[in-house]
Amino acid sequence: MAVSDKYVEKTRTWNDNWNNVIRNVIYPDEKLRELMLIPEGTDILKFIDKYFIRDGSTDELLTNEMVRIVCRDEKMSRGLGSRKVTGHFKTFDIFVNEDVEHTATEDRLQNRQVLIAERLKYLLLRQYNCQNLHFDFEDEYDQWTKTVGYKLYRLTFFYITTV
């Protein structure tokens, strides 16, 4: 048997799995879109271009969006016992305009960014296998920083990929 006979062509990547998470889990969720104040009829391309950006250090200006989520991947530096197994951190930076921070609930006691973080946790952790990815909750915290009128809340998950 030749070496080429043992090779199986890769037809799906881990990146494809994350795109499926956005397409099939995050974007269709009405409650999350309501918390993010996304206008009715916004298509998925505008959603990922304007409201749910995948970029570690975006240069997109926050203009009239009341809520924006910027997500990024970071490879884990410590080993997992095999070169073929890689750990990743998926981090979400949730920016919420101060004008709408306390308007998510009727009693105005809950912060919108915390409710969005809870919803993302629910969506990614409710099933063991979320579009072929298994997420573990890692950490969440208020950054206590402002971006000219916006509050920032950070949410981090951990997942593993194989070669």
Language-model region placement:
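Hydrophobic beta-strand residues in large extracellular and virion-surface proteins
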Residues: 22, 26, 69, 92-94, ...
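Small/polar-rich, solvent-exposed N-terminal microdomains that initiate assembly or binding
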Residues: 1-82
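Short histidine-centered catalytic/ligand-binding loop motif
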Residues: 99-112
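Oligomerization/assembly interface segments of phage tail-like spikes and tubes
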Residues: 83-102, 148-163
